[in-house]
Amino acid sequence: MSQLQVPAEAVTPAAAPEVSHPPKVTAGALRARWKASAAVAFIMREDRLFLLLAVLIGIFSGLAVVCFRLAIEWTQITLLSPSLAPSFPRVVLAPTLAGLVVALLAIHVFPGVRGSGVNHTKAAVYISNGYVPFTTVIGKFVTCALAIGSGQSLGPEDPSLQMGAGIASLIGRSLRLSQEKLRLIAPVGAAAGLAAAFNAPISAVLFVIEEVIGTWSAGGLGAIVLAAVSSVVTMRAFLGADSLFRVPAFRVASPGELLAYIVLGIAGGGASLFLLKLFVYFRPKIQELPSWTLYIQPAAAGLLIGLIGIRLPQVMGAGYAIVDQA
């Protein structure tokens, strides 16, 4: 019987598969990875991330206030003139027509802009879980820039506060922050907007804590301070570091002058209280008027301001320049 011939290659043992060895990890590489992961974990903790977010909110709020002030100045130059004594027709027509346009926008386009920005921000904190519609930010920007720039006796602080709160609310919702952080983020933005408007971060922090939050919170104080400071730094980068009011150097010549300052403080507080009482008295009466008067109320106020401005142009606008020149 002939033997079956088996090919030599058939009985050759198969080559062992190549085993890939993982690259050697040195002790230095392990330390670098550990430090990187520890740094990321440190930064990504929500409380620390919230502080970084406060700086971002301050920057965006500061930019918004810069644009807001430039819009007011552009509107004033366009509708009135660069001087404080523009021509007679412009003094009367500019605030009147601007009031009519503001009424139309507030009724049909931006209904959320009506009322006090401080009260709306407080409602957002305690009722709406920090929610401020971004359309309110746009509406406040447009209507208030038009109203103040046309000469109506309004200040940019209140709309700046609400715009800052709205910007913070938008950023917080976009990042899906927790409900607790969303409630706190509106006052953070409010402080940033107010600080940039006043160029005074400390005053803005104290105002927001007292008026918007109502209580001292150690957890939110750091974020509020960071937002206020970063917004002022941003604003000063574009508009300069000049204070809102320049106070000349003075010294007390005699102790008797302190009595005059006490009287001045009492008189100023009394005048402010009287103005507040007038506002409280007239507001419900105006709200009781027929709804169609909403279209003409801002125009009527603008007409009254324009008529007064013919003789006293200092009453038109925010009035900062007049106070600074006093």
Give the ranges of each region predicted by the language model.
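Alpha-helical transmembrane segments and immediately membrane-proximal extracytoplasmic
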Residues: 1-326
